[in-house]
């Protein structure tokens, strides 16, 4: 357990926008799961199935919503969105210790770079020429920063992140290990012999403020226009964003999803795991695409969209597939019957 700072319940309530139920002077130094929490720690309950622990936990306080507050026999912080409060508590009680500024002696830095003295450049990092890195930004071991790239302040690029040339990253963004930003888009054209000819990809990747990109995600550079990731976008591990895509502010994309080239996704959208979006389409603001959804055309109205089939036993699924194959013949038979009735 990592012990952070100590706060009273009243101080925590003020910080996260909650109401104190019980002793506001109770001291808290850590956040823990409700089944394992000990005195001096605060836990949280967001799911009704865990409410049995309210009378069993050793925690000094619980973070919960108004509906569960009356069932809590110990000190509590009460708010309408305990999950949001939990995130804020972790930031307060488990502050990350960042390394001091400086460039590791094994790092390679090209000519004409502007690296703020407070930035931390880890071991074996390669920074090509004309790169700009802002204050308090951390570049992890083995990362590669391409020529002419610009990274804002308070960013964290974990070990072995790769930025191709001319990439732009705003402030307070996080990129996890193995992510590749700015690789060539999948631009090809067949010649008269039927052979594939590569189309040079000369655009950039532009990433806004407060963006998080998961491990081994890939975002390709644009062909001519830039690939743009808006402010506050959160991209999970193993997501693929193709060339010329534009992702609107505060959209989230879950793991293994893919967005094909030149597609625009609006603001405040949610794209489920393993979803696939066709190229050259537009998704309006406030759209939710459920897991494994296959989106082949533009969506113009906010709402929830699904296209996958629910789980069945193998036996049931095989029957469903056979019936699906029979739909065309059934439709023809239905038309013939309609003609007879008329």
From Swiss-Prot:
<dbReference type="InterPro" id="IPR020573">
    <property type="entry name" value="UDP_GlcNAc_AcTrfase_non-rep"/>
</dbReference>
<feature type="active site" description="Proton acceptor">
    <location>
        <position position="243"/>
    </location>
</feature>
<dbReference type="Pfam" id="PF04613">
    <property type="entry name" value="LpxD"/>
</dbReference>
<dbReference type="GO" id="GO:0016020">
    <property type="term" value="C:membrane"/>
</dbReference>
<protein>
    <recommendedName>
        <fullName>UDP-3-O-acylglucosamine N-acyltransferase</fullName>
        <ecNumber>2.3.1.191</ecNumber>
    </recommendedName>
</protein>
<keyword id="KW-0677">Repeat</keyword>
<keyword id="KW-0444">Lipid biosynthesis</keyword>
<keyword id="KW-0441">Lipid A biosynthesis</keyword>
<dbReference type="GO" id="GO:0009245">
    <property type="term" value="P:lipid A biosynthetic process"/>
</dbReference>
<keyword id="KW-0443">Lipid metabolism</keyword>
<keyword id="KW-0012">Acyltransferase</keyword>
<dbReference type="Pfam" id="PF14602">
    <property type="entry name" value="Hexapep_2"/>
</dbReference>
<dbReference type="InterPro" id="IPR007691">
    <property type="entry name" value="LpxD"/>
</dbReference>
<comment type="function">
    <text>Catalyzes the N-acylation of UDP-3-O-acylglucosamine using 3-hydroxyacyl-ACP as the acyl donor. Is involved in the biosynthesis of lipid A, a phosphorylated glycolipid that anchors the lipopolysaccharide to the outer membrane of the cell.</text>
</comment>
<dbReference type="Pfam" id="PF00132">
    <property type="entry name" value="Hexapep"/>
</dbReference>
<comment type="pathway">
    <text>Bacterial outer membrane biogenesis; LPS lipid A biosynthesis.</text>
</comment>
<dbReference type="InterPro" id="IPR011004">
    <property type="entry name" value="Trimer_LpxA-like_sf"/>
</dbReference>
<comment type="similarity">
    <text>Belongs to the transferase hexapeptide repeat family. LpxD subfamily.</text>
</comment>
<comment type="subunit">
    <text>Homotrimer.</text>
</comment>
<keyword id="KW-0808">Transferase</keyword>
<dbReference type="InterPro" id="IPR001451">
    <property type="entry name" value="Hexapep"/>
</dbReference>
<dbReference type="GO" id="GO:0016410">
    <property type="term" value="F:N-acyltransferase activity"/>
</dbReference>
